[in-house]
């Protein structure tokens, strides 16, 4: 068995490539089922965000598992395998586990220490459980990664003052426009990113904001969180009119197709002299061809790196402290993973002990007689189980805790030989 992650991120692929592989939440269950149908894939979890798509696997064969996951990505994106390989990264076992911990802690994010990734990993874990992709191994890994992510944020200052994708977009808009208070600003979408956009715009003393959304009811829920602000709500069908009266538009919906297209722009009769579109969605909400219009400037998540770099230098120092904590967490994982090697031997030892206990108990009961048994059977059962458990407890604890691979391996072989455990198969022992 091996733990593998196959994926791509903002570090390995541009947004136009990432969006082709993005898996929306509504498709995660289907994707997990497809992956689990491959013969060498035992467990699956899928992490899909605007900056990464990562498939975490437990496989019975490392090479075949990688091949199957890569083939799945090619089939689901209509990309060729050579195209994919240019941008994919593959990590095995300890490297895969450490990568998940770094991702969850915000150390691998475009913005070091950003908080949203922790909730995204939690959702990945929940969906993996819901659609039965996560088994005992990935369950332990994700629980430990989430715990590590929380610990890093609690014990270091990595998330103090960290910017988010939304706040970085607002900062970039301010750099380009200088004074946002005089701009007509529209937000397309009413989800979490839109809420953060409103929050950061208000911190820049922006007074008037337009929210355009397919569901007006959902937009109202967003507006209700900012009662002090002057926020106007519009249906998506009114987007053309709103664009004609906007200087800046932020987009952050979960739409799988572009919403602002060249056709929509051509239908607008009277656009402002300069319209800036800040698209922080993946897949993108703004068709890349919209940038061909002279009076329109389009920015996407990859353009935020300019803003982020100003924030990163001080955060890298904090990241070093976080890395030390993650090394401790990885050591704890290695102890757990090593203990799995002992489980088959421990189970056989327990099974043999139980066979002996039951057989000897039956002999004792036949000698003691029915009257004694009816009055004391529970006590005798408890006594014999207690003796077996006490005898087995120390060797089992020592086997699980042994970190030295060679010592543990020798101990397992000695145990198997001394107790003749190779004869224990399917609960039967031919020698008894």
UniProtKB/Swiss-Prot annotation:
Active site: residue positions: 50 (nucleophile)
Top-level lineage group: Eukaryota
InterPro entries per record: 4pyrrol_synth_GluRdtase, 4pyrrol_synth_GluRdtase_dimer, 4pyrrol_synth_GluRdtase_N, GluRdtase_CS, GluRdtase_dimer_dom_sf, GluRdtase_N_sf, NAD(P)-bd_dom_sf, Shikm_DH/Glu-tRNA_Rdtase
General remark: During catalysis, the active site Cys acts as a nucleophile attacking the alpha-carbonyl group of tRNA-bound glutamate with the formation of a thioester intermediate between enzyme and glutamate, and the concomitant release of tRNA(Glu). The thioester intermediate is finally reduced by direct hydride transfer from NADPH, to form the product GSA.
Protein name, as recorded: Glutamyl-tRNA reductase
Domain-level remarks: Possesses an unusual extended V-shaped dimeric structure with each monomer consisting of three distinct domains arranged along a curved 'spinal' alpha-helix. The N-terminal catalytic domain specifically recognizes the glutamate moiety of the substrate. The second domain is the NADPH-binding domain, and the third C-terminal domain is responsible for dimerization.
Function, as annotated: Catalyzes the NADPH-dependent reduction of glutamyl-tRNA(Glu) to glutamate 1-semialdehyde (GSA).
Compartment annotation: Plastid, Cyanelle
Keywords from the UniProt entry: Chlorophyll biosynthesis, Cyanelle, NADP, Oxidoreductase, Plastid, Porphyrin biosynthesis
UniProt site (Important for activity): 99
GO cellular component: cyanelle
Underlying gene: hemA
One annotated GO biological process: chlorophyll biosynthetic process
CDD domains assigned to the protein according to its UniProt record, in alphabetical order: NAD_bind_Glutamyl_tRNA_reduct
Organism: Cyanophora paradoxa
Binding-site residues for substrate, renumbered to this chain: 49-52, 109, 114-116, 120
């Amino acid at each position: 068995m091996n733990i593998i992650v196959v994926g791509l991120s903002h570090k390995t692929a541009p947004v136009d490539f990432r969006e082709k592989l993005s898996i929306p939440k509504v498709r995660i269950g289907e994707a997990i089922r497809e992956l689990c149908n491959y013969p060498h894939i035992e467990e699956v979890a899928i992490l899909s965000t605007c900056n990464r798509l990562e498939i975490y696997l437990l496989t019975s064969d490392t090479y075949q598992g990688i091949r199957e996951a890569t083939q799945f990505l090619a089939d689901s994106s209509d990309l060729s395998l050579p195209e994919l390989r240019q941008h994919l990264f593959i990590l095995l076992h300890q490297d895969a586990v450490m990568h998940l911990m770094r991702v969850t802690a915000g150390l691998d994010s475009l913005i070091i220490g950003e908080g949203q990734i922790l909730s995204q990993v939690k959702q990945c874990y929940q969906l993996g459980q819901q659609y039965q992709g996560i088994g005992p191994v990935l369950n332990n890994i994700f629980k430990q990664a989430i715990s590590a992510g929380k610990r890093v944020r609690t014990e270091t200052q990595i998330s103090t003052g960290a910017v988010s994708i939304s706040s970085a977009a607002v900062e970039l808009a301010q750099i380009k426009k200088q004074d946002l208070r005089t701009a007509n600003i529209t937000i397309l979408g009413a989800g979490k990113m839109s809420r953060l956009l409103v929050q950061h715009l208000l911190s820049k003393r922006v007074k008037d904001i337009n929210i355009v959304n397919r569901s007006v009811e959902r937009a109202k829920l967003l507006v209700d969180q900012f009662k002090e602000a002057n926020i106007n709500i519009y249906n998506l069908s009114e987007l053309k009119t709103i664009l004609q009266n906007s200087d800046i538009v932020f987009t952050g919906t979960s739409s799988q197709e572009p919403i602002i297209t060249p056709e929509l722009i051509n239908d607008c009769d009277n656009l402002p002299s300069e319209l800036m579109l800040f698209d922080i969605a993946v897949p993108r909400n703004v068709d890349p061809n919209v940038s061909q219009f002279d009076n329109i400037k389009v920015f996407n998540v990859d353009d935020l790196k300019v803003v982020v770099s100003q924030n990163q230098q001080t955060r890298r120092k904090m990241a070093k402290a976080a890395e030390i904590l993650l090394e401790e967490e990885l050591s704890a994982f290695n102890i757990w993973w090593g203990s799995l090697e002992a489980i088959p031997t421990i189970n056989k030892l327990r099974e043999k002990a139980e066979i002996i206990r039951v057989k000897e108990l039956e002999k004792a009961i036949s000698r003691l007689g029915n009257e004694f048994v009816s009055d004391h059977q529970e006590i005798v059962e408890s006594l014999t189980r207690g003796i077996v458990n006490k005898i087995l407890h120390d060797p089992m604890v020592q086997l699980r805790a042994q970190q030295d691979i060679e010592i543990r391996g020798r101990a397992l072989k000695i145990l198997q030989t001394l107790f003749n455990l190779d004869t224990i198969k399917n609960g039967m022992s031919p020698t008894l």
